[in-house]
């Protein structure tokens, strides 16, 4: 990219993520009543969710990544290219960064057809730099039937799909999405989510996705940054962050964890499908999916009970060997238990009486009885 600088040594904290494929970001800026102060090392692939309440700094951080805000204390390296280093007075402006930006409201030209909107997005990208063919972007978002329609006559979901395709057509090295589903009703959201999942599965570019909706984060994200008051409270793989007892996720009434698994077998006689994760089975209502398909499941903390022995005289199909990692007893009547199941985090919410009777303490081996499993993708 013209204006990009090869990545070299930098002062930014890298944490556990290293190498030229990582995203390394440090920003410090503010105004009366708010200050953003983050120092992050993020993966260079997959969907990275910026999650937090309104005013937590999600969009400000996204704008810093885009170069729309210039932090006086700023450093940004994206997959081997240095985009900002204020210590060197280096700042690559937005129009010279190979990124795509999708806003809450699709910013299309209403007087142009969908095809013309897409072609407009290609104008600033030299032919030699086009790594994502326009036809591929069109196919990924399923918009071929819309190409000759006027953009002003599209539904909200259709407009967002076109906006995402236009962003992809610029062959970005980083795709930024600022609550792209926020303006859509439930039906339109459900229509567009499968297309976002396809981007995740088929494109090798990092996507930074802003959302305050836990269900979107659970379905799409690989990595989560939890923001509050302009600071990062936590950052890490979604399965780890969602299960941390010191974070708000785990204390929600609908607290859950996500489990990435594969389809291992179908039991047609009982209309069930056996998923497998970490070598363990997880039964779910029958799926019409090929064997070896990758899926993501959700398990609510309230749907997990504990036993000291493996029970075979119960209607519960999913009984998993586990070890107690930690407890939270902030609720006067209930105990939240974090479990380790063959390296996968699981949460169980049980009564304090049950925890006392069973002797639930860190290090105790137990059996997690999972009463319900929902498929996210």
Curated annotation (Swiss-Prot):
It is found in: Cell inner membrane. SMART domains: AAA. Its EC number is 7.3.2.5. Residues 17-254 form the ABC transporter domain. It is a peripheral membrane protein. It catalyses: molybdate(out) + ATP + H2O = molybdate(in) + ADP + phosphate + H(+). Keywords: ATP-binding, Cell inner membrane, Cell membrane, Membrane, Molybdenum, Nucleotide-binding, Translocase, Transport. InterPro entries: AAA+_ATPase (IPR003593), ABC_transporter-like_ATP-bd (IPR003439), ABC_transporter-like_CS (IPR017871), Mo/tungstate-bd_C_term_dom (IPR008995), ModC_ABC_ATP-bd (IPR011868), Molybdenum_import_ModC (IPR050334), Mop_domain (IPR004606), P-loop_NTPase (IPR027417). GO terms for molecular function: ABC-type molybdate transporter activity; ATP binding; ATP hydrolysis activity. ATP binds at residues 52-59. PROSITE patterns: ABC_TRANSPORTER_1, ABC_TRANSPORTER_2, MODC, MOP. GO terms for cellular component: plasma membrane. Pfam families: ABC_tran, TOBE. Its main location: membrane. Residues 313-377 form the Mop domain. Part of the ABC transporter complex ModABC involved in molybdenum import. Responsible for energy coupling to the transport system. The complex is composed of two ATP-binding proteins (ModC), two transmembrane proteins (ModB) and a solute-binding protein (ModA). Belongs to the ABC transporter superfamily. Molybdate importer (TC 3.A.1.8) family. This is Molybdenum import ATP-binding protein ModC. It comes from Aromatoleum aromaticum (strain DSM 19018 / LMG 30748 / EbN1) (Azoarcus sp. (strain EbN1)). The gene is modC.
